[in-house]
Amino acid sequence: MIPKKLVHFEYIQINLASPERILQWGQRTLSNGEIVGEVTRSETINYRTLKPEMDGLFCERIFGPVKDWECHCGRYKRVRYNKNSEISIVCERCGVEVIESGVRRHRMGHIKLASPVTHVWYLKGIPSYISVILGMPRKDVENIVYYNNNDSISFKNISQFLTENRFFSNSTDILDDLLNIKEKEEEISGGEAIYKMLKNFDLKATAQKIREDLAENEAAWTQSSFFNGEDSDWVLDENQWNKKNQDWQIEEERRNKKRNKLIKRLRIINHFIATGAKPEWMVLSILPVLPPELRPMVQLDGGRFATSDLNDLYRRVINRNNRLAKLNNMLAPEIVVRSEKRMLQESVDALIDNGKRGKALVGNNKIPLKSLSDIIKGKQGRFRQNLLGKRVDYSGRSVIVVGPNLKLHQCGLPKEMAIELFQPFVIHTLINEGLANNIKGAKKIIQNSDPILWEILNQVIQGHPVLLNRAPTLHRLGIQAFEPILVEGRAIQLHPLVCPAFNADFDGDQMAVHIPLSLEAQTEARLLMLASSNLLSPATGLPIISPSQDMVLGCYYLTTEDIRLRGTKSHYFSSLEQVIMAYDQKKINLHTIVWVRFSGIIDSKYIKQNPIEIRVDSLGFVSYIYKNYQMRKDFKNNLISQYIRTTPGRILFNQVIQNSLDYSPSEY
């Protein structure tokens, strides 16, 4: 057996595949010189022997043996026939290569189409690359591909034929020429017509012509040239000026549309030139067939089989392709051949992207068949589901709920989830502290949920950050680190201020939890990824941590005052603590207007206002009464006391801010 070679590569590029490349994928030469790879039959397995049919969709000669080191007929079995051999053995009777069955996961086949068909992505996509390249409306291209039009070329040929002074020829010559015209009409229909048009398309010459047209268009048309016409010497009144300006705007809009169309066409042509792809590769003459292990057929209980939808789509293509080849050999009527070509085009469209053209093909259960595009696109597709979104160990997932008692860098982790995620660390700690003799004993403690377990778990999670991720991760703040806090229930608790960074809300969103294992990963998470260290948006530099929704509403509710209490008897307190005490004793509510003695610095805007009332007592003390402020001074103008008008809610709000800032306020 040939040893496997390691191939090093730097990147993967997705490009158009040429017919030669597709043939190279699905065609191989066996050690006996036989060339295999073409799938010519639509059968899958034999209903009696349950073995794959030869030259079918599961053929062992094309894709490899079903069982390791065993051919189709059973002549070669076990590994001893191929041990220490650089050249694989091919069975002389059935032609199957005696090799491992794992090759059925990557060996491809191919179908040679009896008539070229267009690739539905490049015909029905936005933009339609085929129509843009050819400079034709997409509807006209579709009419040619699906045989929906009356060919203008055929009528042109007939009119040209009738004007060539041939009216006096015999009927046999006229009939021969009309048949020749019919043959010419056949050459310009369907995918074959598109293929010939694309094959004869000169990319570089067309690109140069478009550049010249763009330059000429820019130079020839300016606003000044439009207004400097034959009436440029006349003084225009307002109505004439408005009409001419309106005409110019219409012409400018038309010119911009033409310019954008040329730029779009030039951009696509430049991509073809840069990548080395040829436009005719958008028309398929050879269709690749996926390896059978990627479209399996599984036997169920009771003898029934479950098969991939791709097998039904491939079967439809093969049946129509074989029928078209048979009709071509039979010299069938043109209308029948056209209908079969159109059906072949539709079957290939359904295989590549079912439902792209219109109504999707459905199976026996009335559910649309899953095509090749459906396998790779979307959330459940190959890229997002299997390549970008692989499942990893030491991770979990749950619904998020708000955690109002958490700090910004903390998250609430359910105990049930935490014991599973941190289980290796818990087992290690249980053994080190002598609470368990081995791993089996430690797992028994975990299964029994002993009270000592939660103490050990709290000890383990101290200083061990976890990573929270919400899909889709559109920027780096989609994954942040938090210190876990054990909570009851099964939901992850999240601080509401970090929701904008994750673009999350609490209407059922789910988030994933990942555990950094190594010391380096934990250090990186703590220093770089902690939520309290990511306050600014990496895109704009603006704060991404900002209160919103219920937080803003709560702050407003806390600091508002009840206007219905205006004009009632005011309450006076000698300190802020007395106000809080009265609120705790339910003597007043959050919105009660109170006057409280305050010894701090008052904002100067209150003092600059004119007082509402000035009182002077018998001792010469002066009281200045403002709308929200009162102060009392002695006869030497020394401040004795000052009161401010506020509410208990504002006092609580101010204390929370003071405690978070951890400094004495300079103003209230």
From Swiss-Prot:
Enzyme class: transferase
SUPFAM superfamilies according to UniProt: beta and beta-prime subunits of DNA dependent RNA-polymerase (SSF64484)
SMART domains with a match to the protein in the record: RPOLA_N
Localization: Plastid, Chloroplast
Major location category of this protein: plastid
GO molecular function, one term: zinc ion binding
E.C. numbers: 2.7.7.6
Binding site for Mg(2+): D505, D507, D509
Keywords, sorted A to Z: Chloroplast, DNA-directed RNA polymerase, Magnesium, Metal-binding, Nucleotidyltransferase, Plastid, Transcription, Transferase, Zinc
Reactions catalysed according to its record: RNA(n) + a ribonucleoside 5'-triphosphate = RNA(n+1) + diphosphate
Cofactor note: Binds 1 Mg(2+) ion per subunit.
Positions annotated to bind Zn(2+): C71, C73, C91, C94
Gene Ontology terms describing biological process: DNA-templated transcription
Pfam families (UniProt xref): RNA_pol_Rpb1_1, RNA_pol_Rpb1_2, RNA_pol_Rpb1_3
Cofactor(s), names only, from the UniProt record: Mg(2+); Zn(2+)
The keyword Zinc belongs to this UniProt entry's keyword annotation: yes
GO cellular component labels: chloroplast; DNA-directed RNA polymerase complex; mitochondrion
Transmembrane segments: none
Entry's family note: Belongs to the RNA polymerase beta' chain family. RpoC1 subfamily.
Complex formation: In plastids the minimal PEP RNA polymerase catalytic core is composed of four subunits: alpha, beta, beta', and beta''. When a (nuclear-encoded) sigma factor is associated with the core the holoenzyme is formed, which can initiate transcription.
Described purpose of this protein according to its UniProt entry: DNA-dependent RNA polymerase catalyzes the transcription of DNA into RNA using the four ribonucleoside triphosphates as substrates.
Name this polypeptide is given: DNA-directed RNA polymerase subunit beta'
Gene name for this UniProt entry: rpoC1
